[in-house]
């Protein structure tokens, strides 16, 4: 069994390699949903873009590096490989596939979402994640919004709203995770 360690900083990559990781998955801030990091507070503070992160990690470790976050089409794949990645991981780009079984409302929103149409928020779960800029997500980061409870309390507090929004195909209440490049996927 091979161990793939998802990281968001060079120091995490070095620590993962020292701990025995066989492959490092470098996740840039462009990625949708929660960040895969050993230290969530470091990931929140650093927010490093993929094309800065990949070459820095490739230079720092001696195991294969997979680029993740913001890759959704052949141009992104070629760029990541040129920067030294051995492979890429595509997330949001595959959410529009039938096998993902997300709502048509969410899939259609991803198709028309520009990079600036995403937002980073703790509102859904208490952990920082990138979502489509829905009414709830935008309201959650306003100056008047209460500070979200920590994970998993916030996740439990928003469960009914998220479940109902999904049943009703109401994007504005959904946990509509999406990366910044999702609309590039065909």
Language-model segment annotations:
Residues 14-29:
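A structural preference for short, pocket-lining loop segments at secondary-structure junctions
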Residues 4-6, 27, 66-68:
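A cross-family glycoside hydrolase active-site/sugar-binding cleft signature
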Residues 1, 8, 13-17, 54-62:
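Surface-exposed amphipathic alpha-helices with a cationic face
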Residues 8-9, 28-30, 93:
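Short, ordered loop/turn segments at secondary-structure junctions
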Residues 1, 21, 85:
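Short phosphate-binding/catalytic loops that engage adenosine nucleotides
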Residues 34-66, 71-186:
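Conserved active-site-proximal phosphate/metal-binding subdomains
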Residues 3-4, 163:
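A short linear-motif detector with a strong N-terminal bias
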């Amino acid at each position: 069994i091979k161990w793939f360690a998802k990281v968001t900083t060079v120091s995490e990559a070095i620590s993962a390699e020292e701990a025995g990781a066989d492959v490092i998955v470098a996740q840039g801030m462009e990625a949708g949903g929660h960040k895969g990091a050993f230290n969530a507070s470091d990931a929140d503070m650093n927010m490093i873009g993929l094309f800065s992160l990949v070459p820095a990690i490739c230079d720092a470790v001696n195991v294969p590096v997979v680029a993740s976050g913001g890759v959704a089409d052949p141009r992104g794949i070629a760029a990541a490989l040129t920067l030294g990645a051995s492979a890429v991981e595509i997330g949001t780009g595959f959410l529009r596939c039938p096998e993902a079984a997300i709502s048509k409302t969410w899939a259609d929103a991803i198709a028309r979402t520009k990079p600036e149409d995403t937002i980073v928020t703790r509102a859904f779960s208490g952990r920082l994640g990138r979502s489509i800029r829905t009414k709830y997500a935008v309201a959650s980061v306003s100056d008047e919004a209460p500070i979200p409870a920590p994970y998993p309390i916030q996740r439990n507090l928003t469960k009914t709203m998220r479940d109902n929004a999904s049943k009703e195909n109401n994007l504005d209440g959904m946990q509509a995770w999406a990366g910044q490049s999702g609309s590039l996927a065909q």
